[in-house]
A protein has these predicted regions:
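Membrane-helix/interface signature in polytopic inner-membrane proteins
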Residues: 151-184
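Short loop segments and helix-boundary regions at transmembrane helix junctions
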Residues: 29-42, 52-119, 215-227, 244-247, ...
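Transmembrane helix-bundle core of multi-pass membrane transporters
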Residues: 94-159, 183
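Membrane-interfacial amphipathic/re-entrant helices at transmembrane-helix boundaries
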Residues: 1-22, 64
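Hydrophobic alpha-helical transmembrane segments
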Residues: 10-15, 67-72, 96-100, 139-144, ...
Length: 280
């Protein structure tokens, strides 16, 4: 276990995980409360579609044009999801529509990459990321970007929380749901585009949903729920990275499994605490 702490790339990967967890746990609160759990996977897949297009167009994989293509596709997804809220009134669940977008984007990625030599490797990297090989400069850049997104959310927290907790009430008070949703999903897409390149689709989804679910399971107080989510993300990231080095396993799936184990343990503890209360 201790040998992991002596490896420079361990600390870079850990810091990257914590940077991701910081903003994802907060965004996850909104996503879980809005009931659009799989929007992260769908937007991440839209970003992957943009990268796949860049690969076919022979654009430099780590260059700015690849990033812009990926970001452009996530903005398309953001606009689609903002529009789709209105379709819920036609008795079509939002999650079903999100699932269609996700499946179509993923199928398109497979079709595009089927004829490329690096297709299989690219798909794998999209899923599991590259935490142990991430450039520290990229981590700093992403941290600054997330700080800007966090600042924007702090300034706009009132309308965002109103729409998250009571969208129909917010609309009745004059909030334009489409435009506020567009702003939310655009910032969300900007976050996902950057994080998928580091951690992959699977871990990004895990860091978004699992800490938020853990916090909301434990308490209804937003601040406390966020704190619980951040602690779980920290412990789960350390457990996953140490296990990854110890057993020579991919980093992102190891962290995701660790987060799930912690969530299950928390659920057991909360259940056991509720039983004595039920008897009294």
């Amino acid at each position: 276990m201790t040998e992991a702490f002596a490896l420079p790339f361990f600390w870079t990967a850990l810091i990257a995980s914590l940077v991701l967890a910081g903003i994802h746990a907060y965004m996850g609160f909104h996503i879980v409360r809005r009931g659009v759990i799989f929007v992260d996977l769908a937007l991440a897949q839209m970003a992957a579609l943009g990268v796949a297009l860049a690969l076919v167009l022979r654009v430099k994989e780590d260059g700015p044009y690849t990033y812009l293509l990926a970001l452009g596709m996530t903005f398309v997804g953001a606009a689609v999801f903002s529009w789709l809220r209105g379709q819920e009134r036609r008795n079509v669940p939002m999650e079903a529509l999100i699932g269609i977008v996700f499946a179509t984007a993923q199928a398109t990625v497979f079709l595009i990459l089927e004829k490329t030599s690096a297709g299989a490797e690219h798909i794998k990297e999209t899923l599991v990321g590259s935490l142990f090989t991430v450039d520290p400069r990229r981590v700093i850049t992403v941290a600054l970007l997330y700080a800007a997104i966090g600042a924007a959310h702090f300034v706009l927290r009132k309308p965002f929380f109103e729409i998250t907790n009571d969208p129909r009430g917010a609309e009745a008070r004059g909030r334009k749901l489409f435009w506020w949703d567009l702003a939310f999903y655009a910032m969300f897409g900007l976050m996902v585009t950057s994080s998928v390149q580091i951690a992959g689709v699977l871990l990004v989804f895990g860091l978004l949903v699992i800490p938020a679910v853990a916090g909301l399971m434990a308490t209804s107080r937003t601040g406390v729920a966020l704190a619980i989510g951040w602690v779980l993300a920290l412990v789960g990231s350390m457990m996953g990275l140490i296990g990854s080095i110890r057993f020579d396993l991919p980093a992102a799936p190891s962290i995701l499994v660790s987060l799930t184990i912690l969530l299950v343990l928390l659920g057991i503890v909360l259940t056991l605490r509720q039983k004595p209360a039920a008897r009294t």
